[in-house]
Amino acid sequence: MRAPNKPLPQAIIEAAEKTLHSEDRLVIRAYGFISVTEYFMRDFIKKVLLKFNKPQLAPALGMIIKELTVNAAKANFKRILFIENNIDVTNPEDYERGMRLFREAISESMALEYGKKAKSASLNVHTTFDFDKDRLIIEIRNNLPMSRIEEQRVREKFAQAMRCNDIAEFMVENVDETEGAGLGHQFLRHLQRTR
């Protein structure tokens, strides 16, 4: 991935370097997922893995981090759109109507607009990197509880991923554009098998 046009603030770069050398936790709070954020996270994880002689894992982890972070941000955007359109996340019919609206609205420009709305609403995505020589924990979460319907869909995706032998099989059998496609879960499962 090439470096983004917009540079990161120097304070963020310095904090990441300090974290890398002290093996402390790094927490990144974002309201969307733009190219500068992606570049920063991929570069940081590459440096962490290089430090512990595991650079071969960097491309796969970079994809997984991007997939899960984008899904967490999209969940926030979806909730904002639902609120704007008076959609009840607990009502299955209303939820399906909201998902149709969301699929129609999702775009790069929508992501920029809703990233600003997410910031105004204090809906963020925290990506935490916690590591030392023995382990690497990456936690990606938004600050919005899932509805019962959303949780059920996530659990179905986990079950589908567990039944598939590889990413290609999963993609052919389980393409579902209503939420995230479930690729992050499948990427993680595949990485666990191959490490």
Residue spans for each PLM region:
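Conserved polar catalytic motif of the HATPase_c/GHKL fold
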Residues: 67, 71
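Short N-terminal amphipathic alpha-helices
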Residues: 56-62, 72, 76-81
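N-terminal assembly/transducer modules of large multi-domain enzymes
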Residues: 2-9, 21-50, 54, 189
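Conserved beta-strand-loop-beta-strand hairpin that lines the nucleotide-binding pocket
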Residues: 6-26, 74-195
